[in-house]
Design a protein with these regions (language model features):
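A short beta-loop-alpha structural element at the N-terminal edge
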Residues: 3-17
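Conserved catalytic-core motifs of GNAT/GCN5-like acyltransferases
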Residues: 67, 117-120, 137-154, 163-164, ...
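Conserved GNAT-fold acetyl-CoA-binding loop/helix
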Residues: 16-43
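Conserved GNAT acetyl-CoA-binding A-motif
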Residues: 108-120
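Conserved beta-strand-loop-alpha-helix junction that forms the acyl-donor binding cleft
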Residues: 118-128
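Glycine-rich phosphate/pyrophosphate-binding loop shared by adenosine-nucleotide-utilizing enzymes
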Residues: 2, 61-65, 153
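Conserved acetyl-CoA-binding loop-helix of GNAT-fold acetyltransferases
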Residues: 93-106, 129-133
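Acetyl-CoA-dependent GNAT
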Residues: 35-90, 101-102, 161-163
Length: 185
C-alpha cells in the first residue's frame, strides 16, 4: 500500500538518496552536484511555504516525491507552476508517480492553480509518456539549452490546463499542510 503525505524537512535524507542517482547518472536533472541534506531540507521548507511537496511511502519507506514550484517569479504567473516527480530507481512504473501526481494536482486545484508545466530533458521518453498520460502537451522545445556529461541537451516544456481560467482569476491560495491528509492506495 502507498501512503502519500506532505513532506517534512526531516525527510531530506531519504529524498536525497532517491535524487542522487538522477544527478550523478542522468541528464534528467541538470544539477551537477548532489545537494546536501541541509540544502534539501531547506528546499522542502521553502517549497512548502507556497506549494505542496509530497512524499510516497511504501511499508514505511519513502519511495518517491513530487512537488510544485514557481513557474516565474512575477505576480502575473501566480496561477501557473512547474511540477516535478522523482521515484526511487528500480521501482518506476509501479503507479507511485501517478499517485503522487494525482495528489499534487488535487492540492494545486484547491490553491486555484490553472496551468501546470513540466520541464523534461529530450530523450527522457518515459517522462514524456507519463506526462502525456496526465493530459500534458508539448508546447516548446529549447534546443541545446543545458550542458551535462559532455554534451548539450534539448529541453521540452509540456503544459496542462488544470482548470478553466476565470476572468478575473480566483485568488491564489498558498499551500498549508492542512490541504493534504495522508491518502492510502
Amino acid at each position: 500500500m502507498i501512503v502519500v503525505r506532505t513532506a517534512t524537512p526531516q525527510d531530506a535524507e531519504a529524498l536525497v538518496a532517491i535524487y542522487q542517482p538522477y544527478v550523478l547518472e542522468t541528464a534528467i536533472t541538470f544539477e551537477y552536484h548532489v545537494p546536501t541534506i541541509a540544502e534539501f531540507s531547506r528546499r522542502i521548507s521553502q517549497t512548502l511555504a507556497r506549494y505542496p511537496f509530497l512524499v510516497a511511502e511504501r511499508a514505511g519507506e519513502i519511495v518517491g516525491y513530487a512537488y510544485a514550484g514557481t513557474y516565474k517569479g512575477r505576480s502575473a504567473y501566480d496561477w501557473s507552476c512547474e511540477v516535478t516527480v522523482y521515484v526511487k530507481q528500480g521501482i518506476q512504473v509501479k503507479g507511485i508517480g501517478s499517485r503522487l501526481y494525482q495528489e499534487l494536482e488535487r492540492c494545486l486545484a484547491k490553491q486555484q492553480v490553472v496551468n501546470l508545466t513540466a520541464c523534461i530533458t529530450e530523450g527522457n521518453q518515459g517522462s514524456v509518456v507519463f506526462h502525456e498520460k496526465f493530459g500534458y502537451q508539448q508546447v516548446a522545445c529549447f534546443p541545446k539549452i543545458g550542458y551535462k556529461f559532455g554534451k548539450w541537451h534539448d529541453v521540452l516544456w509540456l503544459q496542462k490546463a488544470l482548470q478553466i481560467p476565470t476572468n478575473p482569476p480566483k485568488a491564489f491560495r498558498p499551500y498549508p499542510a492542512s490541504y493534504h491528509e495522508s491518502v492510502k492506495m
